[in-house]
A protein has these predicted regions:
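Carboxylate-rich, polar loop motifs that coordinate divalent cations or form catalytic acidic clusters
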Residues: 1-415
Length: 415
């Protein structure tokens, strides 16, 4: 057999990869970009990745359908969609151990495995979680987020920040600090066309580009509306202000009205029932309580605690709704409210779909009925198939292990 030079290939320089693509051969070069060989001629394949390839010394390449991965010596991996001509760079600021990629391969689950200069990384390309800000601690510790009037608001231990929601994965986006909000921010409520922000310093109300600080209330952890009462909100507070406070809309302005009588506990997790004047409140010491408020909302007229020997207090408990059921997420597993017996019962059905009888610290169901939850110090995902009406877990649906703030986790699926 005799080897012969492919006509026109002199311009390629050093070749980093030969890949089958649409019945032809896609050629990745070290510095000169991409080319296509159709069996007769070599032609330049122009793409948005040309500049990346010219400046970062492409060492290897892999192809998965129309997704081309280019491993570089100087700046990690360039992911190029050959059909859309869109690219994304994954490097140290996206979580790689180092920038030098010497080999790569896609697996059967479409994950990209990288052989680095020192170590091996796996990029979960099908993961629903990606970094907005790289590895940089841009805004300190995060506690909550919400999209309001086209802007993404982020609550942190440093105050309130805002930016535009990003549609590009693993791309750092600029942050703007909201002046006057320095300190611990806890949670948000989009209500009455306004954004209510709960914080150590009380409640901030954002209305478009304007912001107002409500005087007379401090240490606010969360805010909830009451069914059939559009002119009031209940604020759960802690510390020296522990208890429940009522906010009232008067002449178009929201303002603190009074502190409810007969309840002086810290309110870490707060949830209102869809009818009546019933509230669920949790804290570490008191456990889970269901409160009934008076018709004039001046006081708590009934309080029942739901902890018992198999479900003791002493740990933080998170309240959530799963398919219209009230669920307590705890160190002792998942418990749901049985209205017929007025008790919390073990939620074996849901536990069996998740991690069994385990310690859970967070759980939420998104708009597509997927269930996000935290156990074993990691965020996990139970996927819902609307066509089959079934739930399933993928092997790599475990994220951010060891990076979460226990009992203060938050997931906001906004798109």
């Amino acid at each position: 057999k005799k080897f012969s030079l492919v006509p026109g290939s002199e311009m390629l320089g050093r070749v980093s990869g030969l890949l089958p693509y649409s019945g032809k051969i896609l050629i990745a070069t070290r510095y000169n970009g991409l080319f296509i060989y159709d069996g007769e001629t070599v032609q330049k394949f122009n793409s948005v990745a040309d500049s990346f390839m010219q400046h970062n010394r492409v060492f290897c390449a892999a192809l998965n359908q129309s997704l081309l991965a280019l491993g570089s010596v100087q700046d990690g991996v360039c992911l190029l969609d050959l059909e859309k001509d869109e690219m994304n760079v994954i490097s140290i600021n996206s979580g790689l151990q180092n920038k030098t990629v010497l080999s790569m391969s896609f697996d059967a689950l479409n994950n990209l495995w990288l052989g680095l200069d020192n170590g091996i990384d796996c990029v979960h390309l099908s993961s629903p979680v990606s970094s907005l800000y790289g590895n940089k601690p841009v805004i300190g510790s995060g506690y909550s987020s919400i999209v309001y009037q086209g802007k993404l608001y982020l609550a942190s231990n440093q105050g309130l920040y805002t930016t535009l929601p990003s549609t590009e994965l693993n791309k750092e986006i600029p942050m703007t600090f909201v002046p006057g909000t320095g300190g611990q921010m806890w949670s948000f409520l989009n209500y009455d066309g306004k954004l209510f922000c709960a914080s150590d310093n009380g409640v901030f109300v954002i209305d478009g580009d304007k912001m107002e600080h409500l005087d007379g209330i401090k240490g606010v952890r969360s805010l909830v509306p009451l069914n059939g009462r559009p002119d009031v909100l209940i604020a759960g507070t802690y510390g020296k202000y522990s208890g429940l406070h009522l906010l009232k809309k008067v002449a178009g302005r929201w303002q603190p009205a009074f502190r409810l009588k007969n309840f002086t506990y810290a309110a870490k997790s707060l949830m209102a029932e869809s009818s009546g004047n019933a509230l669920w409140v949790t804290n570490k010491d008191r456990g889970v309580c269901r409160l009934i408020l008076s018709d004039d909302l001046q006081e708590v007229v009934s309080l029942k605690k739901y902890n018992h020997s198999a479900f003791p207090s002493g740990y933080d408990i998170f309240l959530t709704q799963v398919n219209s059921e009230t669920v307590a997420v705890s160190h002792y597993g998942l418990w749901r409210y049985n209205q017929a017996t007025d008790s919390l019962e073990e939620y074996h059905e849901l536990e069996n779909m998740l991690d069994g009888k385990a310690a859970y610290s967070y759980l939420t169901m998104d708009m597509a009925h997927n269930i996000w939850y935290v156990s074993g110090e990691a965020l996990k995902l139970l996927r819902y198939d609307a066509v089959k009406n079934t739930y399933s877990k993928l092997p790599h649906d475990t994220f951010l292990k060891g990076s979460l703030i226990e009992n203060y986790e938050h997931v906001n699926v906004y798109d």
